[in-house]
């Protein structure tokens, strides 16, 4: 018997049964308890969802921007009213501490919808005079039906981030959440319907990567917004281009550097480093896992980090006092433990953690201790590859030029941070770092107003911020001739 029962698809403003006859299970990573059986979408189901979205999009786009804005604002109110209920589901599905999901996941998702609801009426074209009796004007028109493919680490937040600009601009979206954490996207669909979003404008199809491929290759999808790993992102981009030259937005992986200079407030730097590595049990794409510390302060900094790691409260995610929960799945646990073994084998010095936690109630969950490695080298696997778990690598450096070159020596470019009391050096360093999201003397906040996305193989395009709205529209140029037409022939 599962906690939440059978989960169906959400198409055309309500729940429908999948035609595949297949289901998959989702489990509580803290206890191993079966949370739900989820119906897997078939190709026919994806076609049905896209057809429903096309129909709903025409009605949605025909509304005024002010009407769409009001409906989205109602959805925001409903999200906030149901914050505690949604946070409880998210905690069971992801293993995140309840204090985290209550304060972050739904709150930040609602903030982004509210932000774009406010911008819906600000979508404008241009008027360009050519001569006395002729001018050009432009219209920003919706793309049509977009596909959203979510990651497992921030299920409802990612669904909000992807739907908000799409819907504000007059598009519809067919969304596929990760099969690892599939529950809260369905609740968002319920909320949009209750708020007044027309049937079909937001549909949810469940399943593994094969369902994502069906969406990415569908001829009636105009744009794909994907969050996930680099290798999968490359496949998405290839299929999107080969099928119908779809537009793409992709937020992919990272191996982000955090640079601590010799003049840094070391207590502040240690607080930042611990947050940048262990928030959400290290399952955050922007994690600052390569911690470069000036050699003169490395020992003092490391001592402060280890003191803070000892204060991390690992426990049941449903306990209010817990601030560090399990990894999302057994597969992710195995992956992280493999990286830890690699760090030990390659000569990194294990300073904290490094083991699976199995005592008591930990034994039934996917828990790994917060892990810190010292004496790391740039060529180590734990330094070069994305782990997506609670593993910090500390490296030392001597000069500014050296650390910038080493920080940039990666095919990732998602995030970077600098801790220093010298603001001139802070800005100078940040401007030379090849990363799309940067922080000075802080880490991790991504407000609705801030465009987020990566350089290099960490992504294409941006989410959030004003400019993202433009990428959910296409420009139509119109010339108007008021005077006499001068024929060529």
Swiss-Prot record:
Residue sites binding K(+) 1 per the record: 26, 93, 180
Active site feature: 162 (charge relay system), 251 (proton acceptor), 285 (nucleophile), 463 (charge relay system)
PROSITE patterns reported for this sequence: ALDEHYDE_DEHYDR_CYS, ALDEHYDE_DEHYDR_GLU
Signal peptide: none
Residues at which K(+) 2 binds: 245, 456, 459
Positions of modified residues (Cysteine sulfenic acid (-SOH)): 285
Pathway(s) of this molecule: Amine and polyamine biosynthesis; betaine biosynthesis via choline pathway; betaine from betaine aldehyde: step 1/1
Cofactor detail note: Binds 2 potassium ions per subunit.
EC number in record: 1.2.1.8
Superkingdom of the organism of origin: Bacteria
UniProt entry tagged with the keyword Metal-binding: yes
UniProt cofactor(s): K(+)
Keyword hit for Oxidoreductase: yes
One MF annotation (Gene Ontology) recorded for this entry: metal ion binding
InterPro entries: Ald_DH/histidinol_DH (IPR016161), Ald_DH_C (IPR016163), Ald_DH_CS_CYS (IPR016160), Ald_DH_CS_GLU (IPR029510), Ald_DH_N (IPR016162), Aldehyde_DH_dom (IPR015590), BADH (IPR011264)
Record's catalysed reaction(s): betaine aldehyde + NAD(+) + H2O = glycine betaine + NADH + 2 H(+)
Binding-site positions, NAD(+): 150-152, 176-179, 229-232, 253, 285, 386
Site keyed Seems to be a necessary countercharge to the potassium cations: positions: 247
Any GO BP: glycine betaine biosynthetic process from choline
Complex and partners: Dimer of dimers.
The protein's role, per its UniProt record: Involved in the biosynthesis of the osmoprotectant glycine betaine. Catalyzes the irreversible oxidation of betaine aldehyde to the corresponding acid.
Protein name: Betaine aldehyde dehydrogenase
Organism expressing this protein natively: Burkholderia ambifaria (strain MC40-6)
Organism lineage string: Bacteria, Pseudomonadati, Pseudomonadota, Betaproteobacteria, Burkholderiales
């Amino acid at each position: 018997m599962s906690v939440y029962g059978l989960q169906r698809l959400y198409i055309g403003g309500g729940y429908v049964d999948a035609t595949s006859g297949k289901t998959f299970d989702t489990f509580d990573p803290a206890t191993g308890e079966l949370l739900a059986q989820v119906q897997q979408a078939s190709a026919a189901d994806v076609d049905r969802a896209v057809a429903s979205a096309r129909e709903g999009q025409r009605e949605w786009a025909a509304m005024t921007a002010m009407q769409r804005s009001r409906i989205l604002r109602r959805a925001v109110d409903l999200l906030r009213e149901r914050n505690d209920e949604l946070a409880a589901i998210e905690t069971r599905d992801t293993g995140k501490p309840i204090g985290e999901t209550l304060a972050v996941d739904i709150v930040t998702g609602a903030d982004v919808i509210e932000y774009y609801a406010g911008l819906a009426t600000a979508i404008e074209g241009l008027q360009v005079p050519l001569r006395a009796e002729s001018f050009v004007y432009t219209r920003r028109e919706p793309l049509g039906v977009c596909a959203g493919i979510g990651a497992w680490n921030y299920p409802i937040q990612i669904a909000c981030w992807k739907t908000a600009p799409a819907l504000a601009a007059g598009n519809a979206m067919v969304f596929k959440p990760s099969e690892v954490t599939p529950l809260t996207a369905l609740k968002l669909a319920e909320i949009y319907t209750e708020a007044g979003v027309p049937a079909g404008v937001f549909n949810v199809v469940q399943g593994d990567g094969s369902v994502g491929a069906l969406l990415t290759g569908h001829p009636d999808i105009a744009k794909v917004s994907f969050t996930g790993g680099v290798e999968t992102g490359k496949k998405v981009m290839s299929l999107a281009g080969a099928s119908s030259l779809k537009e793409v937005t992709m937020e992919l992986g990272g191996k982000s550097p955090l640079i601590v200079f010799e003049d840094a407030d070391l207590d502040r730097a240690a607080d930042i480093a611990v947050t940048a590595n262990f928030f959400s049990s290290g399952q955050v794409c922007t994690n600052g896992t390569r911690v470069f510390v000036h050699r003169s302060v490395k020992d003092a900094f490391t001592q402060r980090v280890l003191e803070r790691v000892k204060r991390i409260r690992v426990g049941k995610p449903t306990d209010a006092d817990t601030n560090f929960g399990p990894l999302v799945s057994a597969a992710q646990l195995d992956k992280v433990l493999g990286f830890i073994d690699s760090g030990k084998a390659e000569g990194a010095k294990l300073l904290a953690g490094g083991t699976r936690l199995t005592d008591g109630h930990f034994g039934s969950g996917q828990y790994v201790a917060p892990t810190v490695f010292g004496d790391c080298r740039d060529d180590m696997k734990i330094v070069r590859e994305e782990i997506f778990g609670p593993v910090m690598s500390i490296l030392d450096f001597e000069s500014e030029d050296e650390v910038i070159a080493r920080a940039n020596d990666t095919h990732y470019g998602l995030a970077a941070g600098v801790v220093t009391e010298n603001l001139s050096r802070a800005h100078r360093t940040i401007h030379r770092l090849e990363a799309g999201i940067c922080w000075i003397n802080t880490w991790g906040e991504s407000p609705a107003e801030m465009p987020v996305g990566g350089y290099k193989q960490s992504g294409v395009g941006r989410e959030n911020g004003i400019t993202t709205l433009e990428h959910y529209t296409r420009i139509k140029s119109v010339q108007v001739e008021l005077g006499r037409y001068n024929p060529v022939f």
